[in-house]
From Swiss-Prot:
Residues 28-199 form the EngB-type G domain. GO terms for cellular component: cytosol. It holds the Pfam family MMR_HSR1. Belongs to the TRAFAC class TrmE-Era-EngA-EngB-Septin-like GTPase superfamily. EngB GTPase family. Its cofactor is Mg(2+). Necessary for normal cell division and for the maintenance of normal septation. GO terms for biological process: division septum assembly. The gene is engB. It comes from Streptococcus pyogenes serotype M5 (strain Manfredo). This is Probable GTP-binding protein EngB. GO terms for molecular function: GTP binding; metal ion binding. Transmembrane segments: none annotated. GTP binds at residues 36-43, 63-67, 81-84, 148-151, 180-182.
Amino acid sequence: MAEEQVLNTHNASILLSAANKSHYPQDDLPEIALAGRSNVGKSSFINTILGRKNLARTSSKPGKTQLLNFFNIDNKLRFVDVPGYGYAKVSKSERAKWGKMIEEYLTSRDNLRAVVSLVDLRHAPSKEDIQMYDFLKYYDIPVIVVATKADKIPRGKWNKHESVVKKALNFDKSDTFIVFSSVERIGIDDSWDAILEQV
């Protein structure tokens, strides 16, 4: 695999969790942020593309990630898992705090190279999904849209669902769109190609 010549993706560990920029790692390693609705499958995406079972903790309780979680990959790259948005059971003030923390990271972090924006292929994007995509486009942050849970839809319907997602996002053709399934391990190579192109 091409990416393994560049970095050993299995040499990965959680580095730290941060609530604000004073806690961010102080070096110049490139970072890829991962954003998406609660329960869209961010932890499964991280575990699957890194070939690890439990590096990022998956949870049946949405809204579990409450800090920015930095993952070190072979001392050459970092993934930054940001809190999942759109979870109703979190208080408004808590959501506002998360929003501020995410915005501060996305708009001020020099290490950031791109954002993997995860959406659920089964459903039209939520209002928050669309806001996130628009936010990234506004700030000119490279975005890779990964549509998860493809295994829950018959393959013959993937194109139809992809069209629905792209239309709702007003998807920019210059961005990358990847159909992904952690269960069937679909989209791993495409995800790495898109990520490594940005770093």
